From Swiss-Prot:
Amino-acid positions noted as binding Mg(2+) in the UniProt annotation, renumbered to this chain: 490, 496
Any single GO BP term: mRNA catabolic process
Family per record: Belongs to the polyribonucleotide nucleotidyltransferase family.
Cofactor(s) the protein requires to work: Mg(2+)
EC number assigned by the record: 2.7.7.8
Subcellular location: Cytoplasm
Phylogenetic classification of the source organism: Bacteria, Thermotogati, Deinococcota, Deinococci, Deinococcales
Annotated Polar residues bias: 757-767
Full protein name: Polyribonucleotide nucleotidyltransferase
Amino acid sequence: MIGKTFTTMLGGRELSIETGKLAKLVSGSVTVRYGDTLLLVTAQASDTQSKLDFLPLTVEFEERHYAVGKIPGSFQRREGRPGEKAILSARITDRQIRPLFPKGYRHETQVIITVLSADGQNAPDVLGPIGAAAALSISDIPWAGPTACVRVGQIDGQYVVNPTTEQLTRSRMDLVVAGTREAVMMVECGAQTVSEDDLVGAIEFAHAEMQGVIALIEQMRAEVGHEKFNFLAEEGPANDYVPELTEKAKAAGLRDALLTHGKKDRSARLKALRNGLIEGYVPDPTAEGSAELTQALKDAFGKVEKRELRRLILEENLRADGRDSKTVRPIWIEARPLPTAHGSAVFTRGETQVLGVTTLGTERDEILIDDLTAESGDKFLLHYNFPPYSTGEVKRMGGQSRREIGHGNLAKRAIRAVLPSFEEFPYVIRVVGDVLESNGSSSMGTVCAGTLSLMDAGVPLKAPVAGVAMGLVMEGDNYRVLTDILGLEDALGDMDFKVCGTAEGVTALQMDIKVGGITPQIMREALAQAKEGRLHILGKMAEVLAAPRAELSPTAPHILSLKINPELIGKVIGPGGKQVRELEAMGAQVTIEEDGTVRIFSASGESAEAVKARIEAVTKEAKVGEEFEGTVVKIAPFGAFVNLFPGQDGMLHISQLSEQRVENVEDVLTVGDKLKVKIANIDDRGKIDLIRPELEGKVPLREPRAPRGGDRGPRRDSDRGGDRGPRREFSDRGPRPEGARSERPEGQRTERPATAPATQESSQSSDAPAAPVFPRRED
């Protein structure tokens, strides 16, 4: 038998991991199956140690469109660069496995997750981390796993592990948790304003549920795992200089340099201090071996700097900018700095500054999605930009980095929870967060700036959202949670814990751990401290914009909505789209849905209103009893045609013109006359008979026409078959009594005179004047 399969139950469904069947030449290879979702996950490390000073780990998440029976929509009809969802899925796996590689490990390592089958209900993004943990565990790559990953939803107050796609639509949260047997490693969450207690409960629930998966991977490692290869952790000579440099740096004023206010000034003082110490060891930079020694001393000074900063935080509750552990940096906000944008705001917190800009568009502006999900488009876009000048650096600028995509997605999830529905606010919304300065928490600055720009644009948010980044410094059992961390604290600390939400609860959360994991107690403390910081920031935001503006920006587009009878959609479109083109020529775009919802988009409010009025007129449905101020548009021998509203005429019969007998319609009405009319009857074909309201009850109404088709009852002449008797003779072709026929040879039709009126009548009153032919009602 080829391959070996290991199974366990997870969320009431079987999870199976198979190895030894596919991709057998790689160091570690498994297939993960959950329902009908199937993934191939491989792990491979290079044989040689790289010279890089960081862990060269890459995680790729490959979506194959054949997994859902689709052909890619690209020009070449093949998969191209990974989409946003694939990148976010890869980041989930990366953040779970990265902290567990041994210190000093520098072998280039690659984990590739390929989606082979997707059933549309069991999401592959949380199965990829399980496959990565299994592949690394059974491979010869040094790694301190295993880990596991699960998704948790909350439906009707109950936690649900790995909810299906359908269940997620009813869930109050979408929480992804990864961890080891002992602790939580990674958390990512989007929620509909849930409490901190609900979040902690869900995280603990997830950690308990993943234990069966961890046990399964441990069993795999015991039965089919390979021995880990030995690697040489190149410590270098830097560690030899740390003790001596520590004493010299403290004596030279390291503490004061670390506590210097301002990122640039602090960096300059620390650099000057470092260079001064190095000169004592390397008097001649051009001498042989000086470059290697200088680099070793720089590395050693970095370790000294990190240790002293952590000591100040733990022992003295002092941070690099002089704050204590719970204080938020000073905040400055400006609303509507951009005069022509639909909504804009600048949010500055310490030395982190973000320009948030909101743009409103139509359904035609929604982004199209071509991935393995059933989603076809997204009407809310949030783009996070991190240019090199924000940190005072020079770098090559290209496409969006994975970091930018991840930070933007977090801000997007935070704000999406408070957006109105598309039915309530029928705009496609794009928010851009341009980071202008960065010294920590730029993604949280984007949440605040984006929220303010939405409020400035007049988007009716359910509540304002703010975000704050929390940090952690931990030495053994001693730890301290930090509010609103600096970039330096992010780099030298042990946790980056971002929390976003309203005054009522959390809407998004992301946690990355650099140590072996944190306990629920630390997480509770971090969430409680984050709430204090979030409420403080919301208060500062309310001082500038307490609520969304009552009106849209003058530069914002105008969108009007109305509902029409779906059967009348064709009238709005017109033959060959003629009517829609005429509407768009009035300065507006029109979209029509199958349920009859019509949306009008225009840069001008007047144009939008004019198009709406035109559509309402075209689709207006007349009702019996309604009165109108109509206009005579046509005169016929039997009556007058009166326009009630655009596209709809009615017929006012000659018998309804006056209490006295009228011989000639033109004696009473002419084309262009205005008069009040009332709808007396609408037949099965939609033809309208009118009366004059002032004559109602004074003039007998016409009898309604017999419906077309079906049984029409006996004819006036009874049956047409049999002997009808002789025809009446007429001496000329002049007028004849109603119902009379002229004599003609059998089988020969009587030709209509060239002067016969073009007007057609559907029925004829007994008191109508005689006519040379029997006219039919004109449509």
